[in-house]
Amino acid sequence: MSEPMMWLLVRGVWETLAMTFVSGFFGFVVGLPVGVLLYVTRPGQIIANAKLYRTVSAIVNIFRSIPFIILLVWMIPFTRVIVGTSIGLQAAIVPLTVGAAPFIARMVENALLEIPTGLIEASRAMGATPMQIVRKVLLPEALPGLVNAATITLITLVGYSAMGGAVGAGGLGQIGYQYGYIGYNATVMNTVLVLLVILVYLIQFAGDRIVRAVTRK
């Protein structure tokens, strides 16, 4: 493999990591409060509101049901408005965030559902407000589950970013598609696959370590 190709792969790794972690961050900025809202408005929860729950749940389900490659193409006009272009690293972050947010919201809701109801009832009996319950009971107790959700999300985004590479998003996906598939270069394709596997392994390893650390606390 030539030296220019090796440097191209290094840049591809950096672009893939940037797309994954930046979109993961913004996905959590949107998905975490939506997931908390889904939980607290469920029937029987601290601010139960069946109509609001059904509405938010329906919106989340709609966006979760759209395959990412279709979402990527569908959002091209919207992406152009936000970042001024529909190709490249910055453009990819927009649909990646939109694709991740509803996925995160559901995982946050599921993590909160694992919390024993006795803890919530005890907090309510002591006069805690809904916001205090969320901040001091729900989120701390669900922290291991939230870290696990973040790990799964980042791994999913690695795959999404690779798909985005096929339409000019950059990263390892674009290198694999352009030089491996279109250019009939099996060495490049196999190298891209190995690098993606390594990235996923490292993210999973780090996530597992963090989960163990916060669980001990």
UniProtKB/Swiss-Prot annotation:
It is found in: Cell inner membrane. Residues 41-57, 102-151, 207-217 are cytoplasmic. Disulfide bonds: none annotated. Residues 1-19, 79-80, 173-185 are periplasmic. Residues 13-204 form the ABC transmembrane type-1 domain. Keywords: Amino-acid transport, Cell inner membrane, Cell membrane, Membrane, Transmembrane, Transmembrane helix, Transport. One of its GO terms (biological process) is D-methionine transmembrane transport. Gene3D superfamilies: MetI-like (1.10.3720.10). The keyword Transmembrane helix applies. Belongs to the binding-protein-dependent transport system permease family. CysTW subfamily. This is D-methionine transport system permease protein MetI.
